[in-house]
């Protein structure tokens, strides 16, 4: 539109100019050596204008002729690029649809048409993955990881390939490189953290967790929970060799999550062994308020080595005041009363739990009471038989694996904080009770 208006304006100006010259006749005199030429001004003007137009036309034709090969080449390039992007688009759809043959064909076409296009390289790698050609996919991702523009994408592809081949050390290195390049990227943070936990690299996992906190990859509550678990894991590893350091770590975990039983249990156990009974009792009692647990009660009872069974019974009574009606409180009291040979008090503690369907632990405690107080072998066998059929008690469980002791990671998947204190869903296995009967009968 603008060009048409420009041409129209030029024509109007030319016509008006020629009309102006036609209304004002004159001569253009040219004298050169022995020549004398008289030309009307109007005719000279028209001749000059025509000459200029012819020259411009000739230059334009010459330029088009000389530039023809270049334009033709550019046309071919544009056509090839258009064909490449069309193949790229169709290849992405084919990968999404799971069409291996079509994806491979379009990936090859896109690669030929767009040799420097990162998306074409990505499509080639994805089509290779789809067809199971891991070597080609790895080669493409390696090439991408060497270019700044596609480095992170290449590292992620290499990480996934290494993880698929169970090459965990290589996968860890790729994730660490990606994390160093861009800590704000979530996937290397989460992936590296999970691998460090599986390898029990608690120190490295804490550093990665700190990176996640700085870049807000995880909410604050989850950060505190994971940090407490990692600190407790470190304390558990150092308890025998560096008890002071282990106690510091466990106490830090306890401050983060006061209701976390393993942290309080380890801290209380170490403090009690180092003549810090009062501090140990305070830590254990605080966690007991949140989560009554048999390990806490046992450690609390023996917080001062050398105490008599009656002293331990008195101490347990001071603990269960915090949660008097909780089943764990009654079981802890019954344990302490049995050790102190206070049979009636032990019976009274368990009485409310017998009204419902008592668990195996309650039944075995009743067997101990019958064997210790009355030496009634028949009643002992009766309670032991009930214990075999009774509902199971809570235990540490992770991914279907039950454990008497807490562990920071799952023995199946290596996931951090997988163990839960709960009742198993499966039915209890039958266990022999003869040995236990003999032990109780000897009371």
Task: Give residue ranges: language-model regions.
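Transmembrane alpha-helices and immediately adjacent membrane-cytoplasm interface residues
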Residues: 42-75, 100
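TPR alpha-solenoid repeat register
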Residues: 120, 154, 188, 222-223, ...
